[in-house]
Design a protein with these regions (language model features):
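C-terminal regulatory/interaction module of P-loop NTP-utilizing enzymes
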Residues: 1-292
Length: 292
């Protein structure tokens, strides 16, 4: 990767659709300039993937990079490669023949393309044994061809992760140390209000305040009281805004529109198996709605 200059960094920030994450983006770019792989982590719905894609598009001059979304069933076959039956049909002769298919990391190295692994910790650590070796030594043995791939000096790797989220695996400390973690958290209220106004410039000020109050309080309940598994994301704020704007324009009163939107997003962030969690979010929605 060509060393990013100040003008590059300014352009990257100005053209990023995710607003309010300037400091995190600058930190990520500084470490990328030093050649480190980056892990963007934080609560879901705050733009980790969009930021990662934006950075890679700028650095790779377009979509000239690989992207894979990790899953629970992912193995080294998907990341590094492995043998695959020549045919999955009922032909017994072909089904006994195998070909070797390179995984996404191997292809990225061979073609000298940058790589994004989204939802990194939704795959078990065992899927990344080869990646661990690559990040530790700069080398990746390709067993079937008895060759060794070398990590290009300008190769960029970005992964995203929701640490501690349901359905994720705990990363080994050794693997985690190979990355520079950059936190993508909730943006401040001032910036979030500007985002709301982009989507609904004419939405009543009281409704906007109610939406932002709801988001702020869910985040407090998550961070300070642990009463919710997560707070409302900026994506959730946008969905509430758009729903209220459309509903009110079609004749629904603001109080009902807000209550509906808050209940909808409340189910997303609450623990649906925990009645107390659902009750907490419903009571919060009704409390804020009562001010309208």
């Amino acid at each position: 990767m060509t060393l990013l200059k100040r003008d590059d960094i300014i352009k990257i920030i100005e053209t990023c659709q995710i607003k309010g994450q300037d400091e995190a983006i600058i930190r990520a770019l500084m470490y990328m300039n030093l050649g480190y792989p980056i892990m963007l982590y934080g609560p879901p719905g705050n733009g980790k993937t969009s930021i990662a894609e934006h950075l890679l598009r700028y650095i790779s001059k377009g979509d000239n990079f690989y992207r894979i979304e990790a899953t629970e069933g992912m193995t080294e076959y998907h990341t590094i490669g492995g043998f695959h039956p020549l045919s999955m049909s009922g032909n017994p002769e072909l089904s006994r023949k195998f070909i070797y298919k390179d995984g996404v990391i191997t292809r990225a190295l061979q073609e000298k393309k940058n790589l994004l692994i989204d939802e990194f910790n939704r795959a078990p650590t065992t899927a990344y044994s080869g990646l661990f070796m690559l990040l530790s030594t700069g080398l990746l043995p390709v067993e079937h061809s008895e060759t060794v791939l070398k990590k290009p000096e300008d190769w960029v790797l970005i992964v995203t992760a929701n640490l501690g989220d349901e359905g994720t695996f705990k990363m080994s400390a050794a693997l985690k140390r190979r990355f520079i973690p950059i936190f993508i958290g909730y943006i401040n209220r001032f910036t979030e209000e500007k985002v709301v106004r982009v989507y609904a410039p004419k939405l009543d000020e009281k409704i906007v305040k109610a939406i932002l109050d709801f988001a702020e309080e869910t985040r407090r309940l998550w961070q300070e009281e642990k009463a919710l598994p997560q707070g409302l994301s900026t994506d959730g704020v946008i969905k509430m805004t758009r729903y209220c704007d459309l509903s009110i324009s079609e004749g629904l009163d603001g109080k009902t529109a807000f209550t509906d939107a808050a209940m909808h997003q409340g189910i997303v962030i609450a623990d649906e198996t925990d009645y107390a969690s659902i009750q907490t979010i419903n009571e919060l929605a009704l409390k804020i709605a009562s001010r309208l």
